[in-house]
């Protein structure tokens, strides 16, 4: 397939690869890499944040590279997975805090989740970030070393209710969301960043419990879904993110999900069973992922961009384009003038104090 490399450098459709960058500003090498037709987005990390002004400059620089602008994303869940924590950003509690509040007061928990979603999204948008990879929809079985307090609750209906409130708050601010890690990472003990997790359960248990939040009406509000680098050997021999059964038959077919499917980071240990970086990208794409993430290994990113020539379906490009956010505040100073934001921030601040 022709990747339209003959187009002017600043005008080209969004591609299926999301990369990271090293520091507070782009290097010349990174600018060139982000102009590659295969690239469609950038994921930021804590190392990319010094202060509010610097982050705004970085996102503006990334957005100015191309038209349509590259999508800028971040893992900004709250709790221990919150990349930006100071100077323009409110500390968001872990999702387990909201689950514990649910045990005491359902109404307060739902309102707190909505406020957390609004604050999280509004602050990111005010700094030029388009998308957060949240909420975590994994169930808190108490055994996963990587999920833990990132999960709302053990009960899938509680997870769905709290996540829907969080997602509604994000939508009110103008941001879509990405549920993860389909079909569920909570039962697998190993951390897929450094190991290859295995979940030995049968399909019916996973469908009834872990997939329930995706089958809930919440699933229709998700802009994206990220599958787990977990193997469910009694269902399919491939990790979920490389499995047509999980992504096409179940997520697209039985669940009816129509948004973007993002791979988890292809450099994680849980992805290595598939082969080298090209094999991983091909497998994820072939299974049904629209966007593949390659993080923390610029050498592998360069290798993939040099060797991969995917056939990108128009409907996949359309799904990616639909992720475009609609920020309501131009910058953090303007955000402070919004009474809805200030009220929501007060609720979130009080929740952190109550559960610290």
Curated annotation (Swiss-Prot):
GO molecular function: beta-N-acetylhexosaminidase activity
Coiled coil (UniProt feature): none
Metabolic or biological pathway: Cell wall biogenesis; peptidoglycan recycling
EC class (word): hydrolase
Stored Pfam families: Glyco_hydro_3 (PF00933)
Function: Plays a role in peptidoglycan recycling by cleaving the terminal beta-1,4-linked N-acetylglucosamine (GlcNAc) from peptide-linked peptidoglycan fragments, giving rise to free GlcNAc, anhydro-N-acetylmuramic acid and anhydro-N-acetylmuramic acid-linked peptides.
Keyword Cytoplasm: yes
Annotated residues for binding of substrate: 75, 83, 150, 180-181
UniProt entry keywords in alphabetical sequence: Cell cycle, Cell division, Cell shape, Cell wall biogenesis/degradation, Cytoplasm, Glycosidase, Hydrolase, Peptidoglycan synthesis
Gene this chain is encoded by: nagZ
Domain of life: Bacteria
Active-site residues annotated for this sequence: 193, 264
NCBIfam families associated with the record: PRK05337.1 (NF003740)
Subcellular location: Cytoplasm
Chain positions of site Important for catalytic activity: 191
Catalyzed reactions: Hydrolysis of terminal non-reducing N-acetyl-D-hexosamine residues in N-acetyl-beta-D-hexosaminides
GO CC terms in record: cytoplasm
The protein, known as: Beta-hexosaminidase
């Amino acid at each position: 397939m022709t990747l339209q490399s003959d187009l002017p450098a600043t005008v080209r459709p969004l591609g299926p690869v999301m990369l990271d960058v090293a520091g507070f500003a782009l290097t010349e090498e990174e600018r060139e890499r982000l102009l590659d037709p295969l690239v469609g987005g950038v994921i930021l990390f804590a190392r990319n944040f010094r202060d509010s002004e610097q982050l705004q400059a970085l996102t503006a620089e990334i957005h100015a590279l191309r038209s349509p602008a590259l999508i800028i994303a971040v893992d900004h869940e709250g709790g221990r997975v919150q990349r930006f924590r100071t100077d323009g950003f409110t500390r968001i509690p872990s999702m387990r805090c909201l689950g514990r509040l649910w045990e005491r007061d359902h109404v307060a928990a739902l309102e707190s989740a909505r406020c957390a979603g609004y604050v999280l999204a509004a602050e990111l948008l005010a700094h030029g970030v388009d998308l957060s990879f949240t909420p975590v929809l994994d169930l808190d079985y108490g055994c996963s070393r990587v999920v833990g307090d990132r999960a709302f609750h053990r009960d899938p209906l509680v997870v769905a209710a709290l996540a829907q409130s969080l997602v509604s708050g994000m939508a009110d601010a103008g941001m879509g969301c990405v549920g993860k890690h389909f079909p569920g990472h909570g039962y697998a003990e190993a951390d897929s960043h450094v190991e290859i997790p295995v979940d030995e359960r049968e399909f019916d248990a996973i469908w009834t419990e872990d997939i329930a939040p995706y089958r809930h009406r919440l699933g229709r509000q998700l802009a994206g879904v990220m599958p787990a680098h977990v193997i469910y050997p009694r269902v399919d021999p491939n990790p979920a993110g490389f499995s047509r059964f999980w992504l096409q038959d179940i997520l697209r077919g039985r669940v009816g999900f129509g948004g973007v499917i993002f791979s988890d980071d292809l450099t994680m240990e849980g992805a290595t069973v598939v082969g080298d970086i090209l094999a991983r990208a091909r497998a994820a794409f072939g299974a049904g992922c629209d966007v593949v993430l390659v993080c923390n290994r610029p050498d592998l990113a360069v290798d993939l961009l040099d060797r991969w020539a995917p056939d990108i379906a128009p409907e996949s490009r359309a799904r990616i384009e639909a992720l475009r956010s609609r920020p309501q505040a131009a910058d953090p100073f303007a955000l402070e003038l919004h009474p809805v934001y200030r009220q929501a921030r007060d609720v979130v601040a009080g929740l952190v104090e109550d559960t610290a």
